[in-house]
Amino acid sequence: MDTILQFDHSLIFYVHEHFVYSFLTPIMAFISKITSNGALWIIIALLLMLQKKYRVLGVAIIIALGFVFIIGDQGLKPNVARLRPFVDFPNVTVPLESALPKATSYSFPSGHSFGSFASAMTIYLGLGQIAPQKRYLGILALLGSIVVAFSRVYLFAHYPTDVLTGLELGIIVGFIAWKLARIGWNWWTNRHNDVEYEPYTFKRK
C-alpha cells in the first residue's frame, strides 16, 4: 500500500510541477467539464439512438454508463472513501480551483476516466461490427479518454491510480455493455424474424 501511495504522490506532483501551463489549464478544465457525469457520452449515445443503423450502439453506451454509476458512484467510491489529492494536500496551489469537485466527494475510482473508457470501448467494439470502416472513430474516442484521464490528474482532482483503475474498469464494462446490447438485439430480431436487419442495427436489408 505504501508503494502505491508513493507512486501516486510522486507522479501527481511530477505532473503538477512539469506539465501545468496557463494556456493548458482552461483546456483541461473544459475537457473535464464536458465529460462530467458522462454528459458528452450521453449526448453521443442519444444522437446514435436517433439513427436506425447505430441505435444498438447508443443503447450499449447507456448500458455502460449505467454500470459506471452502479459500480463506481454507488459501489466503490463510498466504500473505498479515498480523499481527493487537493484535500490531502490543502496547501498545494491547484491549477484552477473552480474546476474541482466538492471536497466531500471521493476520489477512487475516477468517474470521468471510468465513464469515458467504458463509452469509448463500447464505441470501438460496436463500430467494429456495425461499420468496420469507421472503427477509427472508436480509436479516437479511446485516445480522447486518455486526455480526459490526464485532465483529472492535471487538475489535482484525482490520483494516477484513480484514473488507471477507471481505465481498466471502463474497458471491462465496455466489453460487457456491448455483449449485452448484442444479446438484446438477437432477442429482438428473433422475435421479429419476418424482418431482416443488417447485423446489430435496426436498418432493414
Per-region residue spans from a language model:
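Hydrophobic, lipid-facing residues on alpha-helical transmembrane segments of integral membrane proteins
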Residues: I62-I71, G75, E168, I172-I176
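N-terminal transmembrane-helix/juxtamembrane module of multi-pass inner/ER membrane proteins
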Residues: M1-L40, D73-S105, K203-K205
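Membrane-embedded catalytic cores of phosphoryl/pyrophosphoryl-handling enzymes
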Residues: L96-K205
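Membrane-interface elements of multi-pass transporters and channels
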Residues: H18, S22, L50, Y54, ...
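Interfacial segments of alpha-helical transmembrane regions
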Residues: I44-G72, G138
